[in-house]
Amino acid sequence: MNKIDAREAAWQLLTEFTQSESLRKHALAVEACMRACARKLGSGSPEDENQWGIVGLIHDFDYERWPSLEDHPYKGNEILKERGYSDEIRRAILSHAEYTGVTRDSPMEKALFACDELAGFITAVALIKPGKSLAEVDTKSVRKRMKDKAFARKVNRDDIIQGATALGVDLDEHIAFCIEALKPIAPQLGLDGSAAKAG
């Protein structure tokens, strides 16, 4: 399967199991951050970038149907195995959830953990900006909101911090990196300011 087909198959898998628009947008956001990380930390090959992107895209594909700790990401892992996804992809997805006990050893596994919560948090920060735009988000605004425990309560701040540490990068640098990775897909995420103009 070539890289375009593989990405299309991953998108179809996501949409088959995930109806929520916000979960689909989260998947796209993590995919964008993972592709950027692959260019920075991976081999630099298009195949590598595609694989890292797919991991980001489908890391939570089973969550809407099976949100419990007993099921997610285990149910998804079974489906991925049935559909022929590699051990490398499946292991990375299992490793993004602390409670699975699967250690994060490869750069791809570490990147998924480092991007998952942060991508969601950056999106939440953009949504409260007057223009609902990623262009209004910077590292300072993200760090400020991280201190506000009432804001985006479900996002684990410790995971964001630990993720950057595991990658061996400064937290502010990682936040800025992910903001930049998300900007090209801002229209797909509804974070290009058009939502504010329409409202």
Language model features by range: what are they?
Residues 47-149, 161:
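Divalent metal-dependent catalytic cores for phosphoryl transfer on phosphate-bearing substrates
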Residues 1-68:
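Acidic/His-rich, divalent-metal-binding segments that scaffold phosphate/diphosphate chemistry
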Residues 19-24, 30-41, 58, 109-199:
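Divalent metal-dependent phosphate-bond-processing catalytic cores, especially two-metal-ion Mg2+/Mn2+ enzymes
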Residues 5, 9, 25-29, 71, ...:
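Conserved active-site and cofactor/substrate-binding residues in soluble primary-metabolism enzymes
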